[in-house]
Structure formats: C-alpha cells, structure tokens
Amino acid sequence: MGRIFLEHLGGLKLFNCAQCHTNLTNRSQLISTRFTGATGRAYLFKRVVNLTFSNIQERVMLTGRHMVRDVMCKNCGAKLGWMYEFATEESQKYKEGRVILEYALITEAEGFPSEAATTSH
C-alpha cells in the first residue's frame, strides 16, 4: 500500500476524526449544526478533506429522497457521516456536494492562526 497523503485546512477551530485525530475541516467550512445522524447531532460542511467514500446509495430521509455516499476517515477508516450527491427536492439542492459529519464521531480542537494573519507589514 503506499503512503497516505493527508491534507490540513488550518484554521482557529478544527474538526478531527475522534478515532485517530486526523484533521477533517475547520469552522470556516461549517454551514449548519442543525442536522441529525444515526448517533445524534450532526453538522453540515462545505469542504471536508481526508475522506474515503462508499458507493452511492439512495436514502429516504426526513427531508426527502437523496443519493448519498458514506464518508470514512482516510487514515483509520472510521465511519464519520455521509456526503450528499443528489437531492430530488429543489429545496434540498443546497446540500449537493456537501458533507455531514456526525458530532459523536468527531472532535473539536483549537487550531492556529495562518502565517499571513500573524505577519505584520
């Protein structure tokens, strides 16, 4: 198998895999905290890195029929949530390409300021 390439988005507030602490995303990518997954509270994000994806599945959810992929941590394989590929309801189209991370399966951590933000001119 080769080396696993992992990305890091940086930021002041980070979200990581609860199993292996691999960085997944940051607060600036957060769209909503008003979702529910199999383990309870879940968050919707614009961009999440260091994931692998299952095959597409059709699921009927509270908000309608969706085509989704389960998402797993690229480093340890832990299931973390799902990604919306396609929504049949027009009002749900904003979810397409977005990722749900279940709060019980991730951790929040303090990040660090970017170099550009700390450099004075």
Curated annotation (Swiss-Prot):
InterPro entries reported in the protein's UniProt record: Yippee (IPR034751), Yippee/Mis18/Cereblon (IPR004910), Yippee_fam (IPR039058)
The Yippee domain, residue ranges: 13-110
Keyword Metal-binding: yes
Record's keyword terms, sorted: Metal-binding, Zinc
GO biological process: adult chitin-containing cuticle pigmentation; chaeta morphogenesis; imaginal disc-derived wing morphogenesis
Domain of life: Eukaryota
Cellular compartments per GO CC: ubiquitin ligase complex
A Pfam family annotated for this UniProt entry: Yippee-Mis18
Residues binding Zn(2+), per UniProt: 17, 20, 73, 76
One Gene Ontology term of the molecular function aspect: metal ion binding
Family in the record: Belongs to the yippee family.
Subunit text: Interacts with hemolin.
Name this protein carries in UniProt: Protein yippee
